[in-house]
Structures are given as C-alpha cells and as structure tokens.
Swiss-Prot record:
Catalysed reaction, written as an equation: N(1)-acetylspermine + O2 + H2O = 3-acetamidopropanal + spermidine + H2O2; N(1)-acetylspermidine + O2 + H2O = 3-acetamidopropanal + putrescine + H2O2; N(1),N(12)-diacetylspermine + O2 + H2O = 3-acetamidopropanal + N(1)-acetylspermidine + H2O2
Recorded GO CC terms: peroxisomal matrix
Chain sites annotated for binding FAD: 16, 37, 45, 61-62, 240, 465, 474-475
Claim: Zinc-finger is one of the keywords in the record: no
Keyword Cytoplasm recorded: yes
Molecular function terms, GO-annotated: N(1)-acetylpolyamine oxidase (3-acetamidopropanal-forming) activity; polyamine oxidase activity
Required cofactor names: FAD
Protein name: Peroxisomal N(1)-acetyl-spermine/spermidine oxidase
Length: 504
C-alpha cells in the first residue's frame, strides 16, 4: 500500500495553523494533512461571539495596518468581509504610526472632564518619546534596559520644565501620561513598559492604513479559510500531549513506512508524521515546553521561549439600557488623578485593579443595544479574570458613576469579558520582546528542528505571531508565519522531486 504523499500534522487552528494548512492543501505533493485543535472551535485568538444583538470580538479586534502589504487585509477583501470605507485608498494611506487615536471624551476620577487640549499636548509628548525609542534600534548598548525606564527618565526631565504650571496642573499632566503608559501596555500586551526591551522595540513594523474592524466578526475570516480545507481536515477537542521527534516510528496501516515524528494526544491517540507544524501560543509553550517535546528542545530555543515576553490584554463589554455618552462618541478615556508614571505604588489588586483600565470603546452596529468595550492589560487584567461577572459589573458601575460625576448612573444590565490568561491552551494574549531578549529570539522561535540538519529534514516547524520578528503580536504576523512554514515544506518537497528525476 503506497503512502499518499507526505504526512503533515498542524498543531493549532488559529490563523497561523489554518493559513499553513490552506497553502499545503493546494500543493501538488498532495500531503496527507490533519490539523489538531485542542478546543471545540477554530480561530485561536480570533474569537467573535454574537452578543447583545451584535458581534463582539473577544480576541483580535482590528486589522492593524489595513493596506496592500497586509495579507489579512487582502484575504478579508477577497472574501468580501470589508466595507467601502475600509477598502478605500484614502483609508489605506493613513499613517497612524501605530498609535491609538485621541479620545472623544476624557473623564477623570474627580468626576470632571479633561480638556482635549491638555490631552493632545500630553499625547504629543508621549508618542514623540515612543518614536525616539527607534534611535536605539540595533544599538549594542542602551542607556537603560527598558522602554519604561527611557520614557520615565525623559518625562522626569520634561516635568522640570513645567515651571509655569501650578501643582494641580502638573499632577493632571502626569495622570494623563499614566493613561498613555496603560494604553501602551495594552498595545504591547505587557504588565509594565519596564518589562519591554528598549533596543529591539523599534524593530516592530507598523503598516500604513487606518486600523479597521470586520463588521461581521473577525472570525468570518478564519471560518472562510476553514471552509476552504477538505472536509474533516481539522480534528477538534484534540489536545496534544507530547511531540516525539528525531525518532523512527511506524503505523500498522503502512507497514515498512517509518516516520521521524510521533504526536501523542491527550486522548491516547498516537499519530506518526513526516512533518509537524507547531502553532500553539508562546504562553502555552512557556508553561509546557518541558513536557511538550521529547527529546527536549535545544537549549537556545528553550531559552528563547523563557526570555520572550507574553502578557495579557483583556476586554470587558458592558451593555446599557440607554447610552450616557454623546451620539458621535467613539472612545472614552479615563484618567485617574492620583496616578503618575513616576510613582511606583504597590497597592492591593483587589482595591485598584480597575485603575489599569484605559477607558471604553463605543461599540458600533448593535441593533438595539448600547455597548462599551473596556481594555485592561497586565496583572490587573489577570486578577480581573478571577472575579465573578457580578463583581466586575459592580466595580465598573462604581467607576463610571465616579468619573461621570453621576452617582445615580444606571448600572450596565449585562457584562461579557475575555479571560485569555485563564485559557489553558493560550495562557495570555500575545508576545513582546522582553528585557533580556532580542529579535534574534523571535528568529530562534521560528527555527525548525532538527537544527543541525542531520537526520530527516524539517521534522518540527514553528509558526504563530511569536515567531515573526517584525509583526509579532498581530494576526498578519501569525498568518505570514503559517505561510512561511508551508513554503518551507513546499521548497523541501520540490527539491526532493527535482533530485529524484532521472538525469539524461
């Protein structure tokens, strides 16, 4: 019985795994392909849910840099998932610098509004400093290790020049700057900018285009890719326990055929393969790498997994009977006036977790509901996951009553939130280059096994956002990484065909 082409297993059906599978299925080598998904649905950290009479994104929210060089944008356009505005050339040419737009409304913890003029001044200062971090790209030595340290040093010098401001104005400026630190924590998926390495920070590449959403849900994209695969390609509720590599494994159905890799699943299934593409999140690898690979990973790759950062950014959706914000409001920013990026306060998470919340995005396109989406990163975000829905709703009701100055503000009638740190096969949101690591570690993440080229080639390959040096933390980085590993296998198969041809 002849074997029908190379056997390939893809671990994980996020956009990296699905992208790799789609590309491989169309190759003339006709690989025998299966995707092993630990959960009951595809999409990974792309997770859309019908809720409140509309669609909420519990995972990926925007296409970042929706323009011609963004493969996620191109696929979404090809599948008809974008509107005229998103597809317009004007939208694609906008250069945001990767920075969050200024809010429509700014509320403070004293129940008063903050002037847009002051917010704009502080935004200009903060994002100017963020741009200056690029000066340290590729520097062998930097004056400090982290982005946070650099920002705080520069801000301290700026504070000294605020001689015409009274004490209250200086405090308010620092409180506003603190909200920008919290926003940047959400963007970077970290607890603190003190954890983010300064030298490689500028290596992350921002594509042009005004960030856009998929009105019908981001998961429409992964659903389309899934639908393009042959039936039953994806096995759901099939968590992998251990990947045995650099071996010689057999299967009764194919006597005489040996495979260098054996994937052992939690349900006891043992699946031999020629190649395995691992697309699981870095957070999962951090927790399980010691038992997930046998033999263990090479020391350099194992060290890269430990050194790179992987944090949590969660969303909290609140549904209201009636809106208490203006009709044209898009983003409400919250400023806690007793905070400052220059002060380290070790307060109880129980009492202060909500102060890490950056504010609320007004959700469009809901039939009859009025929905706000709050963003929160770091340890405070992880603590929030441990609370009940009722506790979260109560805390945020108190926050909103305080910042609006309206103690009678009606509570939200329901809440829905993400809990990415608690998700056993994810353990967080996305990666960042942490202090002690560099872009080289992202490249190490992408390096296939075995590394020395001995034995069977390309046994275990790696994809996912944490394997892309310049687009880490993004869906387009994840998709490109899946395509990269598929292309790596295709190149191998093509070279094998070429070598097997008789020479005249």
């Amino acid at each position: 019985m002849a074997f029908p082409g190379p056997r390939v297993l893809v671990v994980g059906s996020g956009i990296a795994g699905l992208g790799a599978a789609q590309k491989l299925c169309s190759h003339r080598a006709a690989p025998h392909l299966r995707v092993l998904e630990a959960t009951a649905s595809a999409g990974g950290r792309i997770r859309s849910e019908r809720c409140f009479g509309g669609v909420v994104e519990l995972g990926a929210h925007w296409i970042h840099g929706p323009s011609q060089d963004n493969p996620v944008f191109q696929l979404a356009a090809e599948f008809g998932l974008l509107g005229e505005k998103e597809l317009s050339e004007e939208n694609q040419l906008v250069d945001t610098g990767g920075h969050v737009a200024l809010p429509s409304m700014i509320w403070s913890s004293s129940g008063t509004s903050v002037s847009l003029e002051l917010m704009t001044e502080m935004a200009r200062l903060f994002y100017g400093l963020i741009e200056r971090t690029r000066e340290f790209l590729n520097e062998s030595e930097t004056p400090m290790a982290s982005v946070g340290e650099f920002l705080k040093k520069e801000i301290s010098q700026q504070v000294a020049s605020w001689t015409e401001d009274d004490e209250d104005t200086r405090k308010r400026k620092l409180a506003i700057l603190n909200t920008f630190f919290n926003i940047e924590c959400c963007v970077s998926g970290t607890h603190s900018m003190d954890l983010v390495a300064l030298a490689p920070f500028g290596e992350y590449t921002v594509l042009p285009g005004l960030d856009c959403i998929l009105a019908g849900g981001y998961q429409g994209l992964t659903d389309r890719i899934l639908a393009s695969l042959p039936k039953d390609t994806v096995a759901f509720d099939k968590p992998v326990k251990t990947i045995h590599w650099n071996g010689s494994f057999q299967e009764a159905a194919f006597p005489g055929e040996t495979f260098p890799v054996l994937v052992e699943c939690e349900d006891g299934a043992r699946l031999p393969a020629h190649h395995v593409i691992v697309t699981v999140p870095l957070g999962f690898l951090k927790e399980h790498q010691d038992t997930f690979f046998e033999p263990p990973l090479p020391a350099k790759k194992a060290e890269a997994i430990k050194k790179l950062g992987f944090g949590t950014n969660n969303k909290i959706f609140l549904e209201f009977e009636e809106p208490f914000w203006e009709p044209d409001c898009q983003f409400i920013q919250v400023v806690w006036e007793d905070t400052s990026p220059l002060q380290d306060t070790a307060l109880s998470l129980q009492d202060t977790w909500f102060k890490k919340l950056i504010g609320f995005l007004v959700q469009p396109s809901f039939e009859s509901s009025h929905v706000l989406c709050g963003f929160i990163a770091g340890l405070e975000s992880e603590f929030m996951e441990t609370l009940s829905d009722e506790e979260v709703l109560l805390s945020l009701t108190q926050v909103l009553r305080r910042v609006t100055g309206n103690p009678q503000l009606p509570a939200a009638k329901s809440v829905r939130r993400s809990q990415w740190h608690s998700a056993p096969y994810t353990r967080g949101s996305y990666s960042y280059v942490a202090v002690g690591s560099t872009g080289d570690d992202l490249d190490l993440m992408a390096q296939p096994l075995p590394e020395d080229g001995t034995g069977t080639q390309l046994q275990v390959l790696f994809a996912g956002e944490a394997t892309h040096r310049t687009f880490y933390s993004t869906t387009h980085g994840a998709l490109l990484s899946g395509w990269r590993e598929a292309d790596r296998l295709v190149s191998l198969w093509d070279s094998q065909v070429e070598q097997s041809r008789p020479r005249l």
